[in-house]
Regions:
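Short, compositionally biased low-complexity segments
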Residues: 66-73, 103-112, 206, 241-253, ...
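A glycine-rich phosphate-binding loop feature that marks nucleotide/adenosyl-phosphate handling sites
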Residues: 152-155, 233-236, 290-301, 339-350, ...
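Gly/Gly-Pro- and Ser/Thr-rich, intrinsically disordered tail segments characteristic of DNA damage-repair
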Residues: 1-236, 282, 365-410
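DNA-contacting surface of Y-family translesion DNA polymerases
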Residues: 188, 196-339
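Short, charged/polar surface micro-motifs in flexible loops or helix N-caps
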Residues: 12-14, 42-45, 301-304, 349-352
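Short, hydrophobic beta-strand segments
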Residues: 114-119, 307-310, 356-361
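Acidic, metal-coordinating catalytic segment for phosphate/diphosphate chemistry
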Residues: 314-410
């Protein structure tokens, strides 16, 4: 069987790099070379940090912290507003360059993708050399840097790309696991979040090597059977998942937005929920799907997510129906504390042709559906910004509920 060769390409501090590249092209100072960040309002000292430069990181500025706190750490911090249209253009551009080199490319988030380079040895006999070619082509043509990780599977390639940054190429082949992977803290392993890392550390499983050497039966008692199997495989560098050129079957649709200013009232939250429902319902209709379950997610200043979900009486793709459900659900579990993130996810999908009973009176539902159709047609002709129902917050996470290594690394 032919040995696999997988690359993982990850944009370095994507949001900030893309804004910096635009400014450099216009003859302005490079944000990457000074203490700078994306997000929030400097004058009002509101919002949160979405991305930061390496010089800002040296002052202790962290992604996700309030702008006011970041400015106290670094008074000279240069703040730039987010521009998601710019991010989308740059994302498409760097993926297009990757496709010039690889027969199979799987984009897993706005700023990262996997390349299956298996069988390309006649074209590219030296994997390191072609990885540098890809990295250098992206920088020379688009003006921003990436890291490239190289291995025999997606997991190890992803872990390799997270080694020293920026503008680096790293390998992590199976023979290198004891030296490069196992000494890392267990929290650095893909799929190990903060809570799980704390649990493992409390059980004296402090490094990835400790995890690889842990008895599977003990690990099952600690984390559960399925999680234990996944963790043990990942710690040993085992990941058979393929690089998929075509998207996996979508199991749910979701959008969430990190807010520039905290939401503190129900009307503010409802405006955001309307924009999110409008966006995600349009994607649902475009794919000819309907949903039976809606989930609302919130995050406060403690950075902990809370979610509640509700089943709909019948499958729906109508924006107003989904918005009404989201409003009601939000009102049930929000405790009034300021919010920094809101999200809406639609799941339990059915074919769009599935017969629906009427949630609204027929006439009301027909009007709502015709409104959706008119809005979809206008956006299809003039672009997504042609019409909006309420203010549209920029989505920081657009979910299709398939496997992705992690959310974008801003």
């Amino acid at each position: 069987m032919q040995q696999r060769l997988i690359f993982h390409v990850d944009v370095n501090s994507a949001f900030l790099s893309w804004e910096a590249a635009r400014r450099v092209a216009a003859g302005e100072p490079d944000l990457r070379a000074i203490p700078s960040a994306i997000g929030g309002d400097r004058d009002k000292r509101t919002g949160i940090i979405l991305a930061k430069s390496i010089p800002a990181k040296k002052f202790g500025v962290t992604t996700g912290e309030p702008v006011g706190m970041a400015l106290r750490k670094c008074p000279q911090l240069v703040l730039a507003p987010p521009d998601f249209a710019l991010y989308t253009r740059n994302s498409r551009a760097f993926i297009a360059i990757c496709r010039r080199f690889a027969p199979v490319v799987e984009q897993v988030s706005i700023d990262e993708c996997f390349l299956d380079m298996t069988g390309t040895h006649l074209l590219y006999p030296d994997p390191l050399a072609v990885a540098h070619q890809i990295k250098d082509a992206i920088f020379s043509e688009l003006g921003f840097t990436v890291n490239v990780g190289i291995s025999e599977n997606k997991l190890l390639a992803k872990m390799a790309s997270d080694f020293e940054k920026p503008d680096k190429v790293h390998t992590l082949f199976p023979a290198e696991i004891p030296q490069k992977l196992w000494p890392l803290p267990v929290g650095d392993l893909l799929s190990v979040g903060r809570a799980l890392a704390e649990k493992l550390t409390a059980a004296r499983i402090r490094t990835i090597g400790d995890l690889a050497r842990t008895d599977l039966a003990y690990l099952q008692k600690l984390t559960g059977v399925r999680t234990a199997a996944l963790l043990h495989n990942y710690a040993c560098g085992v990941d058979p998942s393929p690089v998929l050129a075509e998207p996996e079957a979508v199991k749910c649709y979701g959008n969430s937005t990190t807010l520039e200013q905290d939401v503190t009232t129900v009307p503010q939250a409802n405006q955001v929920l309307l924009a999110l429902c409008d966006s995600v319902a349009a994607r649902l209709r475009a794919d000819g799907r309907r949903c039976l379950c809606l989930t609302v997610t919130i995050r406060g200043s403690d950075f902990k997510n809370r979610s509640h979900q509700r089943r709909l009486p019948e499958p729906s793709d109508v924006t107003q129906e989904l918005y009404d459900c989201a409003k009601s659900l939000f009102a049930e579990f929000w405790d009034g504390r300021p919010l920094r993130l809101l999200g809406v996810t639609l799941s339990d999908l059915t074919d769009g042709q599935t017969q629906q009973l009427s949630l609204f009176p027929d006439e009301k539902r027909d009007r709502a559906r015709k409104l959706d159709q008119a809005v979809d047609q206008l956006r299809g002709k003039f672009g997504p910004a042609a019409i909006s129902r309420g203010p549209r917050p920029p989505p920081t996470h657009r979910l299709h509920c398939k496997f992705t290594p992690k959310p974008p690394d801003p």
